């Protein structure tokens, strides 16, 4: 019967990842539980929500090998409140788990291990390794433009694909498009899959963890599943979205007639300030561009108006340059601009305008990040 000693901090961190996987309104008891398996000096923690399966291994002192399942939320809440640096977990008569510190003890009811689902096997058609830092970069640069419209299920995730040694991530909600990529060290078979939003969020948390960010992640792909192996001790298996992602290359503007170059932070801060006056029903900020100034303004129904002016400058900290003699007035959903400007921490951002009519998609680039591009549709103002 299971008995082990574990560092409280280490257990708490793993339970945090497990809790994130499990659906909060889970009506199936087995899927609200976590399986604990103690063997060979390790504790394996398994959690699932049917679409995702997470397995984590942490080093512990195993006094007796064994495995049990227990309510994830309850176990996590208890462990979080323990002041002790170490805890002893002991299986009691198959139906209970004892969690014991120096002066405090809990007994939790358990469910049979036989009722907990096993991780599905996967027959990979493609497998490769990249750094966790690179993978985090392409997911963070694209996750915010995933469509939330469930009727457009093929847009409810990030399109991961390889083409000619380039590993791409792309997402779109029909109003904006985000693309980020890295170059692989070796040539891999071309492929394309759609990673669900929830899966993207969970693997991003894992690769950004301090113990993983400087390691590699192995990615294994089949026709309907994707498996991530991070730092050898963490495995995330996810179902894929069964659908076809649109050919997004057709939506990327191929030419421009004018360009705005501006300090990213100055621009982002101004957009965020002016957007305060806008209302949820119709969120729009107006950009009035000329060679000398950029005027950012907005009108909020039953709220008022707001306006800010940025003057032309060649100073790095306040850089602003618009390269067309004819002025341009164009509107954007401020949230769409803010998402892009927050995703890439670069000094300078460039906006490319295809025409002066202010109705064509706008291409956004960052000179220091050439492998990230964004497209936003303007709105009427």
UniProtKB/Swiss-Prot annotation:
Pfam families hit by this protein: DNA_pol3_beta, DNA_pol3_beta_2, DNA_pol3_beta_3
Alphabetized Gene3D superfamilies for the sequence: 3.70.10.10, DNA Polymerase III, subunit A, domain 2
SUPFAM superfamilies membership: DNA clamp
Subcellular location, record wording: Cytoplasm
Gene Ontology biological-process entries: DNA strand elongation involved in DNA replication
Signal peptide: none
Gene Ontology MF annotations: 3'-5' exonuclease activity; DNA binding; DNA-directed DNA polymerase activity
GO CC field: cytoplasm; DNA polymerase III complex
Keyword annotations from UniProtKB, A to Z: Cytoplasm, DNA replication, DNA-binding, DNA-directed DNA polymerase, Nucleotidyltransferase, Transferase
InterPro entries: DNA_clamp_sf (IPR046938), DNA_polIII_beta (IPR001001), DNA_polIII_beta_C (IPR022635), DNA_polIII_beta_cen (IPR022637), DNA_polIII_beta_N (IPR022634)
Highest taxon of the lineage: Bacteria
Family: Belongs to the beta sliding clamp family.
Function in brief: Confers DNA tethering and processivity to DNA polymerases and other proteins. Acts as a clamp, forming a ring around DNA (a reaction catalyzed by the clamp-loading complex) which diffuses in an ATP-independent manner freely and bidirectionally along dsDNA. Initially characterized for its ability to contact the catalytic subunit of DNA polymerase III (Pol III), a complex, multichain enzyme responsible for most of the replicative synthesis in bacteria; Pol III exhibits 3'-5' exonuclease proofreading activity.
Self-association and partners: Forms a ring-shaped head-to-tail homodimer around DNA which binds and tethers DNA polymerases and other proteins to the DNA. The DNA replisome complex has a single clamp-loading complex (3 tau and 1 each of delta, delta', psi and chi subunits) which binds 3 Pol III cores (1 core on the leading strand and 2 on the lagging strand) each with a beta sliding clamp dimer. Additional proteins in the replisome are other copies of gamma, psi and chi, Ssb, DNA helicase and RNA primase.
Protein name: Beta sliding clamp
Organism: Rickettsia prowazekii (strain Madrid E)
Lineage summary: Bacteria, Pseudomonadati, Pseudomonadota, Alphaproteobacteria, Rickettsiales
Gene name linked to the record: dnaN
């Amino acid at each position: 019967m299971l008995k082990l000693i574990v560092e409280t901090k280490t257990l708490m961190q793993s339970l945090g990842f497990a809790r994130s996987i499990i659906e909060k309104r889970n009506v199936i008891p087995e899927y609200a539980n976590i399986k604990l398996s103690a063997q060979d000096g390790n504790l394996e923690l398994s959690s699932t929500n049917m679409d995702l399966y997470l397995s984590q291994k942490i080093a512990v002192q195993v006094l007796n090998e064994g495995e049990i399942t227990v309510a994830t939320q309850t176990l996590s809440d208890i462990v979080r409140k323990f002041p002790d640096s170490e805890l002893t977990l002991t299986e009691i008569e198959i139906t209970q788990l004892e969690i014991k510190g120096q002066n405090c003890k809990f007994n939790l009811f358990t469910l049979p291990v036989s009722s907990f689902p096993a991780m599905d096997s996967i027959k990979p058609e493609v497998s490769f390794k990249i750094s966790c830092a690179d993978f985090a970069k392409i997911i963070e640069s694209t996750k915010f433009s995933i469509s939330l419209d469930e009727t457009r299920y093929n847009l409810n995730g990030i399109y991961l694909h390889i083409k000619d040694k380039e590993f791409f991530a792309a997402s779109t909600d029909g109003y904006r498009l985000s693309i980020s990529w890295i170059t692989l060290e070796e040539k891999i078979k071309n492929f394309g899959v759609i990673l669900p939003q929830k899966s993207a969020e969970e693997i991003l948390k894992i690769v950004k963890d301090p113990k993983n960010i400087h390691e590699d992640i192995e990615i294994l792909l089949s026709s309907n599943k994707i498996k991530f192996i991070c730092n050898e001790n963490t495995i995330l298996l996810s179902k894929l979205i069964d659908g076809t992602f649109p050919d997004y290359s057709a939506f990327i503007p191929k030419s421009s007639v004018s360009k705005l170059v501006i300090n990213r932070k100055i621009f982002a801060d101004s957009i965020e300030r002016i957007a305060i006056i806008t209302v949820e029903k119709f969120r729009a900020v107006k950009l009035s561009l000329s060679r000398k100034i950029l005027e950012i303004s907005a009108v909020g129904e039953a709220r008022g108006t707001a306006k800010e002016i940025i003057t032309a400058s060649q100073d790095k900290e306040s850089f602003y340059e618009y390269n067309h003699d004819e002025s341009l007035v164009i509107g954007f959903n401020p949230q769409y601009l803010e998402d892009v400007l927050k995703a890439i921490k670069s000094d300078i951002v460039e906006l490319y305008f295809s025409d002066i009519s202010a109705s064509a998609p706008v291409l956004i680039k960052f000179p220091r990040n050439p492998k990230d591009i964004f497209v936003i549709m303007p709105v009427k103002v």
